[in-house]
Structure formats: C-alpha cells, structure tokens
Amino acid sequence: MPGEGERGGRGTGKEAILDAARQEFGERGYAAVSIRHIARRAGVSLSAMYHYYTGKQDLLHALVNGSGQAYFDSCRAESEQAGDDPGEQLAAVVRATVRYRAEYRLESNLTLTEWRSLSEEQLEEFRRRQFDGTRMFKEIIEAGVDQGIFRTPHPEDARRGVIAMCNAVAQWYRESGEESVDDLAERYVELALVLVEYRPAARRPRPSAASPAPRPDVRSPP
C-alpha cells in the first residue's frame, strides 16, 4: 500500500484537486487553508477548481465521505472472514481499524477532527455513518456478552475504550517506527480482548432440544 508521501503526487483534474486538499488540510488544518492554496498545490486554475467543487467545505465532505466508506469497506472485508465467533469478529474489526488509521493518517485525522466544519446536511450524513461504526462494535460486544465469552460487566465502557484507542493510532503512528502496522494491529487485538475480558472457554452452551420423556413400562408384573 502506498505511503502518504506517495499519495501526495499530482493526478489529473478532480483527482489532483482532492489530493491537494488532503495534503493542505493535513498540513495546515482546515481553517487555515484557502481555496487558492488548494488550487495552487493542484496546479489548476480557480475556475477549474469550481468546475468540480463548490468550495473547500465541499472538498472536506468528499474526503471525509470517501475515507469513511473506505474504512467501512475494510472492516466489512475483515469481518466477513471472521465467522460467527464474537471474539474473532472483534479481532477482525480492531485489526482493520488500526491498519486503516495507521496507513491513512491524513484521511483519518481529517475525519476524526475536522468533521465539525461540515454543513448541517453533511453532518447528518456523517453522524449516520458514525452511528453505523458504533453499532458495528456494539453488536459484536453484546453478542460476546450474551454468549458468555466476553465477561466484562461494563460492555459500553469497553466499547468506548476499544474505539478510542484504535482511532488514536492516527495521531501518533509514524511509518518510520520500528514496529510494523501488522504487529501494532495484533497488539491492539490483544488489548481489545483484555478490555472485554474474553474467555472463550466460558461460552454458554446453547440449549438443546428437550429429550423425549421415557416411555412408561406397561409390562404386566410377573
């Protein structure tokens, strides 16, 4: 997967503008960036810029929306391979989240920190997606608690803790570090399973069909 520096190269037209906005917002912060900064970095005129986007808020929305969709696609791809076990499902979405936050730090930080700059209509869409993300973790943890393999007495706190620590990776992870993304993801899987108090041996047996009552002995006494 290409690093962030490689994604900074100019494309053509709409792609170049979006890429320039990603870099400008990431380096300066959304509030400090003007539409002229983005056009200059993309190597296009303002008229070309407005042909594709109405302004920098529209660009932010495109970046946040695209990042959110890519993140959910990665979580879905991982979870579909995890089977029905809540422990494996939680490991899958934690792994996908950490990898995405580490490999796409610019996009992740924009999504996690600049969403307040969206319009009211755009915020509604963002909050729906945010709710879907929360529900994904919530349903997995609730299933594990119901089955008796997640023993935490505080599933909501565990969910918030897991999501927060995974999202925070985008703020501090650097590719030049000694630890690979895969190693980091596996360590966070271990931490997440500790938070939910994963006990696979404690799975509650599913109720089986009732055994038929024994037939009465109708033989005559000797």
Predicted regions and their residues:
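Helix-turn-helix
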Residues: 16, 20, 24-58, 62
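Hydrophobic alpha-helical connector segments
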Residues: 62, 76-106, 159-162, 201-212
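Hydrophobic/aromatic residues within well-ordered alpha-helical segments
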Residues: 56, 63, 67, 71, ...
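Amphipathic alpha-helical packing segments from all-alpha helical-bundle domains
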Residues: 69-76, 121-147, 156-160
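C-terminal peripheral helix-coil segments that are non-catalytic and often amphipathic
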Residues: 1-2, 96-99, 103, 134-143, ...
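Amphipathic alpha-helical segments used for helix-helix packing
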Residues: 102-121, 138
